Amino acid sequence: MKQTWRWYGPNDPVTLSDVRQAGATGVVTALHHIPNGEIWSIDEIQKRKAIVEEAGLEWSVVESVPIHEDIKTHTGQYDLWIKNYQQTLRNLAQCGIYTVCYNFMPVLDWTRTDLEYVLPDGSKALRFDQIEFAAFELHILKRPGAEADYTAEEIAQAERRFATMSEEDKARLTRNIIAGLPGAEEGYTLDQFRQHLATYKDIDKAKLREHFAYFLKAIIPVADEVGVRMAVHPDDPPRPILGLPRIVSTIEDMQWMVETVNSMANGFTMCTGSYGVRADNDLVDMIKQFGPRIYFTHLRSTLREENPKTFHEAAHLHGDVDMYEVVKAIVEEEHRRKAEGSDDLIPMRPDHGHQMLDDLKKKTNPGYSAIGRLKGLAEVRGVELAIQRAFFSK
């Protein structure tokens, strides 16, 4: 695997020098300062690329070129935004950047309720609490019809939880859900959030798939033409939330994508922490079935709690993800490629580390502090080395 590291640009508290010292050789970044839908110019791409290369690193993966909400709802200037997206892909290819991670999650990107969940050892993790999320949706957002998405017991628990919340607790929960987490390009006030949700009132899973298919049929031929590999990121969490459909959550969704646009440019990001939240997702089987189309991996683990829809981010080698078997399957795919004459390593980044040690005293991007990811990268690197030596050394 090619070891990479997500970097949020010049304002990231983790520097490129830190990244290099961590042992990564590739950088995963994006032009977050460019508004959604606008073209990434060659000049802007080259500026960022030069910064990365001056630090002795390579810009390996774009994460992400965000998709404008008009494209997802098939309204407004969606065709203009698609044309702009096509041009951005051409410009990236002209600059020698050929792997693009993106997602098709409506309204929200990845979602958590607690950004400072304290673990028994004193480090902090990200957490999604199903009951707190229900409390937000039922009693703060007050989304019409939300009760249908919860069990009677969850509704009762959410009511009790909400009754114990201070005003600051309510404000913090609201911020965590709607204000935008690292990598998300959208942040909302509560009223704006309600308005955006309303734009999806007539969009179910089938309709969102229709809009996604329209996007893929416009984008993938351009990607194919210029040599860009599109790697869709799964929904996080991988299930419908807030009455919104989710369409990249299961192996069936992956198969639908391949059947919709059967091009090798139409590929996947294997995010084990997203897909792995669902007990019915067999990560190793996903890798084995779609290995040739896996162009990027996010390796992390989560741990489902008593309510299986509640989870927190576990240490990279613990939790519900069998990281050994996952890494072994990825390495096997790389060796399959090698046997066919390709030296195409799969970029991997350690995802969402715990906030720990002196990072606890620093202002960090949630999930993206340095030391927790350094630990995760070192652990995964060790697993890969052991697998390479045990199964593939001559």
Swiss-Prot record:
| Keyword Metal-binding appears in the UniProt entry | no
Q: List the cofactors.
A: Fe(2+); Mn(2+)
Q: What is its EC number?
A: 4.2.1.8
Q: Which stretch is the leader sequence?
A: none
Q: Which UniProt keywords apply?
A: Iron, Lyase, Manganese
Reaction it catalyzes: D-mannonate = 2-dehydro-3-deoxy-D-gluconate + H2O
Against Pfam families, the record matches this protein to:
UxuA
Q: Which family does it belong to?
A: Belongs to the mannonate dehydratase family.
What is the documented function of this protein? Catalyzes the dehydration of D-mannonate.
Q: Which PANTHER family match?
A: MANNONATE DEHYDRATASE
Identify this protein by name.
Answer: Mannonate dehydratase
Upper lineage ranks? Bacteria, Pseudomonadati, Pseudomonadota, Gammaproteobacteria, Enterobacterales
- State the encoding gene: uxuA
